[in-house]
Amino acid sequence: HYNCPVVAYYPEVIAANVGDAAKITLIHDYLGLHRKRDFPVKAHAMLNQYFDGISLKEVKKAAKAAYEEYYGYFEKVRARGEETAEKQGKEVIVLAGRPYHVDPEINHGIDKLIASYGVAIISEDVISSRVKKFHTGVLNQWTYHSRLYAAAHYLKDQPHMNLVQLVSFGCGVDAITTDEVRDILESEGKIYTQIKIDEITNL
């Protein structure tokens, strides 16, 4: 259960390269959100390295509220996506991108352009949880990649759904995901579509 290695190590890069970083409290300890039971204890130990007077009870309360909000967000995304996908007479495009691709300055309005052709658009978050574990041709350890592969696999029994993958030039790891998603889709008789985004600010 890992996140993007580039993003995960931004704090390390800052600490090593920004001289003024030593003058501020830069917290970049490693915590696993997937271990819900252990998280409050580890978060409490981490916070006590930097601040005084934070009790374990307070951290447990905050963690409980945070997890509820986290899971609630995904439930809302899935519910809205399912509502969109079930509209009568509409083809569905699973527009799969990294989390930062929801930023209009990055995605260039590609979602709106595709929607203008009369299709419904959902994200991979909506359907990825419907798939049980399955074999992949690559080491499947990153959170986003797991959702992406699961979404592609789910489409095998969905004739009205197709997947479009957004890829940024700067993401080297997507050299792996694009090949695997292509293999999954083509093995299921689907056409793989990739849109590679550069760093301009319009279409």
Q: What are the functions of these language-model segments?
A:
Residues 1-203:
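An N-terminal assembly and electron-transfer interface module characteristic of large anaerobic redox
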